[in-house]
């Protein structure tokens, strides 16, 4: 019986039929002949095509990966394809048949060397089964191609494509474009292949390293091909730009551009310093371990018990726990284990691993020399054409541009900018060396070689790319964008220090463009705040960007004090639309009107002066501090520049911005202590140690002082600080937050001339046009529910009345006020159906107009968003059903209006309409009176002449009265009729007025009735005064009238008494003419008396009573009203002089006066004059 092994039981991962077909084709392709050289088979070209079909069908369409594994197992690449290319390489261009075979072999090499990728969406079992084997096979392909000794395979691939490259662009066929593409893709695959991290290799990594690839590219003149293609992009080559971009990316990623252009001597010194620093770190680490390391005497071990504060005992083993209690506690903490639950994170696929550009790559001396020469030639000849063409392709989003190309574009832009800056510094150092014959020229100092990534178009594309990456959380893309932006800022900084004035002007212009956009400032702040474990490379990029941006912005803001930034904010834009005018008179209210003000929230752009302190305050917060703290935790792996970057930020937070409270957290304090005191802290011999030690000592002093001022800080050290906590710890009290009350929208009304049903139709039409049918349906549902409820109540009320009538005895009479005492139906509360509806009931003035028109009432303050809406008791079920019918009618049959107007044109702002109406009535009255003033006959009395009485003080400025109510609109006939009535009234008053200048002797014109009335009033006044005087004597008052008057005036001045004398109630000396005047003043908008509140009127009336009681002998009031020329238009008052001895009152029109509650103008001077005259008689 034959012996079997486990291999016999193992299942073949490849389908045997596929394996047989592929192996038979490879066998027929050719092999090694008797002479030791490779011999092609008779049907070699057909075999190559069949193998390509199998590869395309099996691995492309069926997605199995079986064919690629069979070809790897059969050693197709090294044993056949490379031998075929080496055999036909000398005559590949001349012989057409050989050229076809070479192209077929190259077409087969490209998919075999294409980096293996596992698509997480379309991956199958075969991908995971064959993936590691194929990856290792591809590394073998790369090693064979780079180390193949019988031919230069890469150079042969370029020779195959040379005939197609020589054809002009317009004359090339698709086959020529395909040959050029597969040759460049073959070069790209060789540069792209790297050893896998998931599978071990049995070959030397140096044979497939970056240095070996660069040396091979140099030996086989691939760099010259890349320079030729890149410099001719846009002229001879178009679709090949992205392939060249990928080749450059995989050649240059991870290479330090600073070291690349260093002099050999300086580079050796730098490498020696790095080695020294590493040895110092290792020595410090070993020294820290040696402090607690076991000695040769502890061969039996040690175990101790530690008694804690809670009387619990803990056992610790090891000699390192002996000595201090702190060492025991630290040992106890180290032995604690916490199995933190790990969430299944996103698995990093092969593409992301290949696209990683933060891992440094070491180069050999020869590789560094070759790549440096290539980069210098590329910057001189090919950088601008290639990157200009790529930027345009990315902007247009052409089909050949993929997502990864934008990331590679910005990373390479930053890399080449850094290389150019390093090259310029080296050239300046050479020029400064007297022993070096190198001399700088104007071209060497100019930055024109990298101009295509320093223009405005690139900045716009970069900003858009960074914002998109941040929104989509594509952190690798954002990392590349941040590196590019940082390097642009550093390049601009070096341009500003250039010796050429043109470069300085360009740098000033670029800085102005970058710092002008406030969105750029906000984006940098948000990127810094949003760090959440994206990796060390991302953390390094974001901290470097924030550091460089903040320092350059601070320097630029100091140089440009009047720096303006473009700010985008939410604003309210008011648009006014003027309706068409019709009719002859365009000034009439009904003919010209403005439509309602439409307020729309939109992004508005405005410029404002830049305040760096404001930006720095926004830049420094708890999230940004956490980002730098996370970066500082890698302090043992950071170089000097990175440590200084962290130190500058913490120094700004603690001392410049005086926000050291943000750093008062237990983990941050422990980190600072560990960095300085260890274990595993900073090396005291490192260049950054001194600065850090000084900062930590000052900061801890500040913390101790702050804890003494605010003991609450001890508790807050356990938590991150929010703004409210920061304010409390700084000031000792909480911030007072004042909430602004929301303002109600402007009230609307339908223009006059329409009935209520038509007005409802207008409101319904507006809501329908604004796509607010849901609000209309909600109002209708509320009305339907209210109508049913009101109808049920009315039915119950009728039943109650019928029952009461049946229980009443037959002979009992019904009381007359039964109807008045009958109960009213309860008001119905209007409830919103959602939170949006509740807000609309307050903010949507169109909806409020409809609710008001159908009968809803609003209870509460005007600006109260929570005010209640009700359906009043006055509305019966019939009224509500009528409103429902109107809503249904106008919803499906909206009314139409004349001249093509819409319902929006028929509504207006109620307050604006009231103001316009008031101004128009005033102007009409003034014009009519001015026109008719000439026609009025005042007889022998001259109107408007000033009295001889001297004024009491400086005349107060008159102000127009602000009315509370809205005046009623008047038509033309009514206005004419009222104006005519006013003119007649004024003529009658002027005819009856008598000035003291024209008063005759009383003996000539004797009127007994008037004299009797006058003496009767005087007697009544005298009696009232004596009664008041007696009451004051009875109460024991010793104050004089003058002191009481002064007290009254002082009290009124404290309560902000109005400037004009108050209204007097039922004065015995009030003329009928004066009352008429005041009624007219109250009804006429041109009246100038200020309106009074109820509190002022009550206070002034009590004050007047005191004055009338206590000052009977005062001749005139201190604050009397002085007449002016303008007062004659509303009614002339009697002119009175202090020397007058005889006064006659005109009160013939008492019967014509009508009572009115409106406050009238007081006549303080007349009362004083009458008192003096009566006493003299």
Swiss-Prot record:
GO biological process terms, semicolon-separated: DNA repair; DNA replication checkpoint signaling; meiotic cell cycle; replication fork arrest
A Pfam family it matches: TIMELESS
Superkingdom of origin: Eukaryota
Main location: nucleus
Composition bias, Acidic residues: 586-597, 923-934, 1002-1011, 1071-1080, 1145-1155
GO MF annotations in UniProt: DNA binding
Extent of Basic and acidic residues compositional bias: 893-908, 935-955, 975-1001
Compartment(s) of residence: Nucleus
Biased composition regions of type Basic residues, renumbered to the chain: 1054-1066
Cited InterPro entries: Timeless, Timeless_N
UniProt keywords, alphabetically: Cell cycle, DNA damage, DNA repair, DNA replication inhibitor, Meiosis, Nucleus
Ranges of biased composition (kind: Polar residues): 1129-1140
DNA repair listed as a keyword: yes
GO cellular component: replication fork protection complex
Keyword Cell cycle assigned: yes
Region feature (Disordered): 332-353, 576-598, 802-830, 893-1012, 1028-1177
Subunit structure: Component of the fork protection complex (FPC) consisting of TOF1 and CSM3.
Listed PANTHER family: PROTEIN TIMELESS HOMOLOG, TIMEOUT/TIMELESS-2
Function: Forms a fork protection complex (FPC) with CSM3 and which is required for chromosome segregation during meiosis and DNA damage repair. FPC coordinates leading and lagging strand synthesis and moves with the replication fork. FPC stabilizes replication forks in a configuration that is recognized by replication checkpoint sensors.
Family according to the record: Belongs to the timeless family.
Protein name: Topoisomerase 1-associated factor 1
């Amino acid at each position: 019986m034959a012996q079997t092994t486990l291999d016999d039981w193992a299942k073949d991962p490849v389908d045997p039929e596929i394996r047989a077909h592929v192996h038979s084709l490879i066998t027929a392709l050719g092999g090694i002949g008797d002479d030791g050289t490779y011999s092609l088979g008779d049907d070699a070209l057909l075999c190559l095509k069949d193998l390509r079909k199998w590869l395309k069908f099996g691995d492309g369409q069926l997605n199995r990966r079986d064919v690629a594994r069979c070809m790897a197992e059969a050693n197709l690449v090294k044993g056949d394809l490379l031998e075929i290319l080496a055999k036909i390489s000398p005559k590949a261009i001349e012989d057409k048949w050989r050229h076809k075979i070479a192209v077929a072999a190259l077409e087969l090499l490209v998919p075999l060397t294409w980096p293996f990728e596992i698509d997480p969406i379309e991956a199958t079992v075969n991908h995971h089964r064959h993936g590691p084997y194929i990856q290792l096979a591809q590394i073998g392909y790369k090693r064979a191609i780079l180390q193949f000794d019988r031919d230069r395979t890469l150079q042969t691939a370029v020779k195959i494509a040379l005939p197609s490259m020589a054809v002009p662009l317009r004359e090339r066929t698709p086959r020529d474009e395909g040959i050029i593409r597969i040759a460049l893709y073959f070069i790209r695959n060789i540069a792209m292949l790297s050893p896998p991290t998931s599978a071990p290799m049995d070959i030397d990594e140096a044979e497939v390293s970056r240095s070996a690839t660069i040396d091979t590219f140099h030996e086989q003149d691939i760099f010259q091909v890349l320079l030729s293609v890149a410099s001719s992009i846009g002229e001879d080559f178009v679709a090949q730009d992205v392939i060249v971009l990928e080749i450059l990316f995989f050649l240059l990623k991870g290479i330090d551009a600073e070291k690349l252009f260093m002099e050999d001597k300086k580079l050796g010194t730098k490498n020696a310093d790095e080695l020294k620093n590493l040895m110092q770190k290792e020595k410090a680490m070993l020294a820290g371990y040696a402090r607690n390391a076991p000695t040769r005497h502890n061969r039996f071990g040690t175990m101790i018990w530690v008694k804690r504060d809670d009387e619990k005992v803990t056992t610790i083993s090891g000699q390192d726990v002996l000595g201090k209690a702190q060492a025991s506690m630290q040992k106890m903490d180290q032995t604690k284990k916490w199995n933190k639950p790990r969430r299944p994170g996103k698995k990093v696929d092969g593409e992301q691993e290949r696209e990683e550009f933060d891992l440094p790559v070491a180069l050999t001396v020869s590789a560094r020399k070759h790549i440096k020469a290539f980069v210098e030639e590329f910057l001189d000849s090919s950088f601008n054409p290639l990157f200009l063409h790529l930027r345009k392709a990315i902007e247009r989003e052409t089909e050949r541009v993929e997502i990864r190309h934008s990331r590679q574009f910005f990373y390479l832009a930053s890399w080449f900018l850094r290389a150019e800056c390093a090259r310029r510094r080296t050239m300046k150092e050479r020029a400064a060396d007297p022993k070096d014959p190198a001399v700088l020229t104007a071209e060497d100092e100019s930055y024109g070689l990298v101009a295509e990534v320093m223009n405005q178009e690139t900045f716009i594309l970069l900003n858009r790319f960074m914002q998109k990456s941040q929104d989509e959380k594509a952190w690798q893309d954002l990392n590349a964008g941040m590196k590019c932006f940082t390097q642009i800022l550093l390049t601009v900084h070096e341009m500003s220090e250039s010796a050429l004035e043109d470069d300085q002007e360009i740098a000033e212009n670029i800085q102005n463009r970058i710092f002008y956009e406030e969105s750029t400032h906000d984006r940098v702040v948000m990127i810094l705040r949003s760090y959440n474990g994206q990796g060390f490379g991302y953390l390094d990029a974001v901290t470097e960007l924030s550091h460089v941006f903040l320092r350059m912005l601070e320097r630029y803001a100091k140089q440009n004090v009047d720096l303006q930034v473009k700010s985008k904010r939410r604003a309210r834009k008011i648009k006014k639309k003027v309706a068409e005018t019709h009719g002859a008179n365009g000034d009439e209210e009904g003919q010209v009107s403005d439509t309602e003000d439409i307020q729309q929230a939109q992004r508005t752009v405005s410029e404002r002066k830049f305040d760096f302190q404001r930006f720095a305050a926004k830049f420094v917060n708890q999230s940004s501090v956490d980002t730098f703290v996370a970066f500082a935790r890698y302090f043992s792996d950071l170089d000097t520049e990175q440590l200084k970057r962290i130190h500058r930020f913490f120094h700004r937070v603690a001392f410049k911005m005086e926000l050291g409270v943000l750093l008062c957290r237990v983990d941050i304090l422990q980190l600072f202590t560990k960095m300085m005191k260890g274990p595993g802290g900073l090396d005291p011999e490192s260049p950054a140690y001194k600065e850090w030690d000084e900062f930590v000592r000052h900061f801890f002093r500040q913390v101790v002082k702050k804890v003494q001022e605010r003991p609450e800080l001890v508790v807050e050290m356990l938590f991150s600080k929010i703004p409210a906590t920061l304010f409390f710890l700084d000031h000792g009290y909480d911030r007072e937050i004042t909430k602004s009350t929301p303002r109600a929208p402007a009230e609307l009304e339908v223009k006059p001339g329409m009935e209520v049903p038509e007005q409802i139709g207008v409101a319904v039409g507006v809501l329908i046009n604004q796509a607010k049918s849901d609000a209309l349906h909600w109002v209708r549902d509320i009305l339907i529910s209210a109508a049913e409820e009101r109808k049920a109540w009315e039915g119950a009320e009728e039943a109650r009345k019928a029952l009461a009538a049946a229980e009443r005895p037959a002979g009992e009479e019904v009381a007359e006020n039964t109807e008045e005492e009958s109960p009213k139906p309860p008001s119905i509360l209007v409830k919103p159906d959602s939170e949006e509806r509740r807000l609309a009931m307050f903010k949507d003035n169109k909806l409020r107009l409809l609710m008001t028109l159908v009968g809803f009432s609003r209870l509460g303050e005007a600006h109260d968003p929570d005010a209640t809406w009700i359906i009043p008791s006055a509305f019966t079920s019939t009224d509500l059903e009528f409103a429902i019918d109107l809503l249904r009618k106008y919803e499906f049959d909206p009314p139409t209006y004349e001249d093509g107007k819409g319902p929006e044109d028929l509504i207006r702002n109620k307050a604006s309409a009231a103001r316009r109406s008031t101004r128009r009535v005033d102007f009409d009255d003034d014009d009519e009176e001015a026109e008719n003033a000439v026609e009025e006959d005042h007889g022998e009395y001259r109107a408007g002449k000033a009295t001889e009485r001297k004024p009491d003080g400086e005349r107060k400025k008159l102000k127009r009265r602000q009315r509370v109510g809205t005046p009623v609109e008047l038509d033309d006939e009514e206005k004419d009729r009222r104006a005519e009535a006013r003119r007649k009234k004024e003529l009658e008053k002027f005819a009856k007025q008598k000035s003291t200048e024209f008063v005759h002797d009383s003996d000539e014109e004797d009127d007994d009735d008037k004299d009797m009335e006058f003496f009767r009033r005087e007697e009544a006044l005298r009696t009232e005064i004596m009664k008041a005087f007696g009451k004051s004597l009875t109460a024991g008052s010793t104050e004089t009238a003058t002191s009481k008057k002064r007290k009254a005036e002082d009290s009124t001045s404290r309560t902000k008494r109005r400037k004009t004398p108050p209204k007097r109630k039922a004065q015995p000396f009030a003329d009928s003419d004066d009352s008429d005047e005041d009624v007219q003043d109250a009804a006429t908008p041109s009246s100038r008396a200020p309106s009074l509140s109820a509190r002022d009127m009550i206070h002034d009336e009590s004050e007047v009573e005191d004055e009338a009681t206590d000052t009977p002998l005062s001749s005139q009031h201190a604050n009397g009203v002085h007449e002016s020329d303008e007062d004659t238009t509303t009614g002339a008052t009697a002119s009175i002089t202090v020397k007058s001895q005889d006064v006659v009152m005109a009160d013939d029109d008492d019967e014509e006066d009508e009572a009115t509650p409106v406050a009238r103008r007081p006549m303080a001077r007349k009362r004083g004059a009458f008192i003096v005259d009566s006493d003299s008689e």
